Amino acid sequence: GWSYDDVLPYFKKAENFHGDGDEEFHGYEGPLHVKKSDRTDDLLLDKFIEAGQEAGFPYTRDFNGKQQEGVSRYEHTINDTPRGPRRWSSAQAYLHPALERENLSNEINVTVDKLIMDGKKVKGIEYINKKGERKSCFANKEVILSAGALGSPLILMRSGIGDPNDITKHGIELVHELKGVGKNMQDHYGVTSSFYATQPVTLHRSASWIKTQIAGIKYLLFGTGDAAYPPCSGGGFIKSSPEKDLPDTQLHYVLSLIHISEPTRLASI
């Protein structure tokens, strides 16, 4: 199934966790490196966490452990290498090592159009390459569709799988009626609150052309500087009211820059 207990073993199998956390919720031998932000050059990061506690929100040492509620530093998919921390994507964890296999072909700059069906069984895919040419690829055993919350239902509907009301009006032959396809998407509403810093503690310190180049060089050679860490290194999961059983609001602390095109009043910190 898809319950928490059912999927937790797979998350643990994927993870290689570095740091202090609730061990029963983490994996330590997987290919995807995960560590809590250890950034030291963001003077406002820990101040944000302190302010959250002063506002009455608890501190949690592990968002992905026993207690999600609270404020803390985020965990990132980062791997500590001899040249410092490096972003560690799922491509680096899974795809790059597998590219050496003789039975794997990887195509880039293509768009999957639809599934090739044999009755109600998927036997391959049709895709369009960067030259605009339509190509076909067939599977010996199975096809795994993993194109995201928007891409997956779009491919299914173009293949004739989904709600007939959504499919047939576009002249697509219905293969299988499944009314949930493309429905029930849940997304976050985001509200940005920006503050004017009176001291040089934001990314403005690296905003000039020469400073941007220096930041990139420091990251590539030493794994340090503003380019070495995500701008969002801390946050919180909180309840919008005490009556809530579980946190229903997420806070992000972002060390960033904004461009103001219209007169705007910003609070100073």
How would you describe each model-predicted region?
Residues Y10, L115, G124-G216:
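Glycine-rich loop(s) and the adjacent beta-strand/alpha-helix scaffold that form part
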Residues G1-V122, I128, T192-A215:
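Conserved redox-cofactor binding core of oxidoreductases
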Residues G235-K239, Q250, R265:
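Cofactor-binding catalytic cores of oxidoreductases
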Residues Y127-E133, I238-D245:
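Short acidic, glycine-rich loop/turn motifs
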Residues Y28-G30, I108-T111, K121-K123, H170, ...:
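Residues that flank catalytic or metal-binding motifs in active/ligand-binding sites
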